[in-house]
A protein has these predicted regions:
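A short, well-structured edge-of-sheet supersecondary motif
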Residues: 30-44, 61, 281-307, 399-404
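Non-catalytic, structured segments within soluble enzyme domains
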Residues: 100-266, 399-414, 418-423, 437
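Conserved catalytic neighborhood of penicillin-recognizing serine enzymes
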Residues: 93-118, 233-237, 243, 247, ...
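Soluble, non-transmembrane domains of envelope/secretory-pathway proteins that act on or interact
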Residues: 13-15, 20-21, 34, 214-238, ...
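Active-site loop and adjoining helix of the penicillin-binding protein/serine DD-peptidase-beta-lactamase fold
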Residues: 134, 138, 190-208, 252-264, ...
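A penicillin-recognizing enzyme superfamily signal
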Residues: 258-281, 291, 302-313, 324, ...
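Active-site SXXK
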Residues: 67-70, 74, 268, 296-297, ...
Length: 688
């Protein structure tokens, strides 16, 4: 007896917890992600050992269920002080002690696990401990508090713990909506959680008769069979941000308030899904988008995919395509190697590399001739970008990208070569969006943040003046018209700056841009890296970008940035006039009134500009041969020059040549038949 007394004293101390403490320690198995206004965005299971929902108040539980539980488990609950002496005396002659356990005693065992025997039935020693603990609870708690806590902690069936988990898991409804039949089934499960559906329904019918519920037992049996035989599927209350929820809801973080805006998040996801449906026939299955506030870096929308995949495409590395060009030109202007009016030659180019000749092409497989930096970037021409990379240096460009947060650019410039200018490196949408946000913030960099719990510091990465010039180019419709036209999915009715990109073989498609207040980035493609069919940045990602920008600026204006002191605007003209005279932006000290180019070279200097000597051209097996063309180029373009391929005149160079596998000889002659230049090249592929 002395040992029992000491045991009871220890139990009493352990069970001496108030209602508020027990409720505060309670943790749902479901993590909840809230938006910036406190609206539930996503519910995600984070505890795989048990299934608990949110704590449920007694007022939110069906009265029928409360009556059924008290009748089944503790008929004199409101009359005793923790111990039902009548039930206890009645159980003395039986083998078990289960029938004498009051709700208070059962609750004590839930609060203090030491009162539950492991792997065996409770004996009188555990019963005695529970009795003492129950008396302590009754002294400090109200009856309603005891009942409420009990119904949130008791196990019903399998992993379902608490009335809300059981109600939603078995009947797909909140406990406030339980009818009499459902209440009887759940009440019986407390004592017999693993019983067969038939046994549960039999006991529920008996319980219903005792409560004088008008129960149809055959119907109850059918309902029980359906509920207990069906796999438990607890549908989340909200499922609008699965990828960010999986990132933020970890460990003990079961409730996180994010910076997302629920209305924008849901709209953004719907827009992306609609676009994926629209272009799905073109071998496009997935997409992602990110919306960020420029000033704070707070994430307003994070959609990691259009489907149910766990892959978060906001963070997944993919080839960048042309989206890195703004940062290449920004570096060249910052170092005063180029200006927005500098002239670049968009003509055939062959560069020696560690793997052989590097021969870049424009997206449209043609050449524009002499173009300014403004036109080159605005119209996303590839060859001028590669020429710029040769001036800037691959090492310097790779280092700048790392400064901007492109963590996957982790090798020196030689590894990437000049192809880095065309996006051969892998980047994530998250990194791209923040890099463009850095441009929007005039070169000030800080991480983007999905919660307000993170404190960030700004640091200057880009020169303010050069960033302003690049921003102005990306906002210039005329600059992009050479490739995209004046009216396209990049044109907004308010001020914005934007860049598209398409990676090799159309595997990735990007559109990233910003307004005065927001930066929006969109990616479309396939998680398995398979190529899309005839999908460009303008037709794939850009429509989503445009729709989101319009939504964001329904009532919010977007004004162009003010010119910094380090930049001036002046009139510039081009001689010869390959581009019209215009007002142009310069870093102070680099301005010029005229850009003069040498006159056309004499015929004596005529040469074949493309292909280069020893070039190897490859036929694409995925494109019908009749759709493929090789465009030869000579300088100067003169009617007195004749280009022959394998001894036969080619005629109109602008029509292109359908490639044929094998070695070929290209020769250039003047009007008298004199040989001016010759080039040998090879075509490799399956077609002959």
């Amino acid at each position: 007896m002395l040992l029992l007394g000491l045991s009871a004293l220890a139990v009493q101390v352990q069970a001496d917890s108030d209602f508020a403490s027990v409720r505060a320690r309670y943790q749902s198995s479901e993590g909840r992600l809230y938006d910036r206004h406190g609206e539930l965005l996503h519910e995600l299971r984070v505890n795989l050992k048990q299934r608990r929902m949110e704590w449920t108040r007694l007022d939110d539980i069906s009265p029928a269920f409360l009556s059924a539980v008290i009748r089944a488990e503790d008929q004199r609950f409101y009359d005793h002080a923790g111990i039902d002496w009548r039930a206890l005396l009645a159980s003395l002659g039986s083998e078990g002690t289960r029938g004498a356990s009051t709700l208070s005693m059962q609750l004590a065992a839930h609060i203090d696990p030491t009162l539950k025997p492991a792997g065996r039935r409770r004996g009188w020693s555990e019963k005695w401990g529970q009795m003492q603990a129950a008396r302590t609870l009754e002294k400090n708690w109200s009856k309603n508090e005891i009942l409420e806590a009990y119904l949130n902690l008791v196990t019903f069936r399998g992993e379902l713990q608490g009335v809300t988990a059981a109600s939603r898991g078995l009947f797909d409804k909140q406990p406030s909506g339980l009818d009499q039949t459902e209440s009887l089934v759940l009440a019986v499960l407390i004592r017999s959680p693993n019983a067969s559906p038939l046994r549960v329904s039999e006991r529920a019918c008996v319980l219903g008769a005792g409560l004088r519920f008008p129960v149809d037992c055959p119907s109850l049996t059918a309902r029980t069979e359906q509920a207990l035989r069906t796999a438990v599927r607890l549908r989340p209350h909200a499922a609008d941000a699965p990828h960010l929820a999986r990132r933020l809801l970890k460990g003990k973080q079961t409730s996180v308030t994010s910076t997302l805006d629920a209305r924008l998040q849901r709209y953004a996801r719907a827009v992306l899904v609609h676009q994926l449906d629209t272009i799905g026939a073109q071998r496009v299955s997935e997409g992602a988008l990110l919306v960020v506030d420029n000033a704070s870096g707070e994430v307003l929308a994070w959609v990691g995919g259009g489907g149910v995949s766990h892959v978060d495409a906001v963070r997944a590395p993919r080839q960048a395509g042309s989206t890195l060009k703004p940062f290449l030109y920004q570096l060249a202007i910052e170092k005063r190697l180029l200006t927005a009016a500098s002239v670049l030659d968009d003509s055939p180019l062959s560069l020696a590399s560690t793997t052989g000749l590097y021969v870049p092409h424009n997206y449209e497989r043609d050449f524009k001739g002499l173009v300014s930096v403004r036109t080159s970037l605005g119209s996303s021409l590839n060859i001028p970008a590669v020429r710029t990379a040769t001036v800037v240096g691959a090492d310097a460009f790779a280092a700048r990208l790392r400064e901007l947060g492109f963590q996957h650019v982790n090798r020196d410039g030689d590894y990437y070569g000049f192809a880095l200018a065309l996006g051969s490196a892998e980047v994530s949408l998250e990194q791209l969006v923040n890099a463009f946000r850095t441009l929007a913030n005039r070169g000030q960099y800080s991480p983007i943040v999905p919660t307000r719990a993170v404190s960030v510091q700004n640091r200057r990465v880009l020169d303010e003046g050069a960033s302003f010039v690049i921003t102005d180019i990306l906002a210039d419709r005329s600059a992009r018209s050479l490739t995209f036209g004046l009216e396209n999915a990049l044109a907004t009715p308010f001020w914005s700056a934007v860049k598209t990109g398409t990676s090799k073989d159309m595997r990735d498609n990007w559109c990233v841009g910003f307004s005065e207040r927001y930066t929006v980035g969109v990616w479309v493609g396939n998680f398995d890296g398979s190529p899309m069919q005839d999908v460009s940045g303008v037709t794939g990602a850009a429509p989503v970008w445009l729709e989101l920008m319009r939504f964001l600026h329904t009532r919010t204006p977007s004004r162009p940035p003010r010119t910094p002191a380090s930049v001036l605007e002046t009139e510039v003209q081009f001689t010869p006039a390959f581009e019209s005279a215009r007002r142009e932006l310069f870093l102070r000290g680099t301005e010029t009134a005229e850009v003069r180019m040498p006159t056309t070279p004499p015929l004596a200097q005529a040469r074949i500009r493309y292909p280069g000597r020893g070039s190897i051209l490859a036929i694409d097996p995925d494109i019908p041969i009749e759709m493929q063309r090789v465009f030869f180029d000579v300088a100067p373009r003169d009617a007195h020059l004749r280009l022959d391929l394998d001894g036969r005149p080619l005629g109109n160079l602008d029509a292109g040549w359908t490639p044929a596998a094998g070695t070929h000889q290209l020769t250039l002659h003047d009007a008298n038949g004199t040989l001016m230049d010759e080039v040998g090249f090879e075509v490799r592929g399956a077609y002959h």
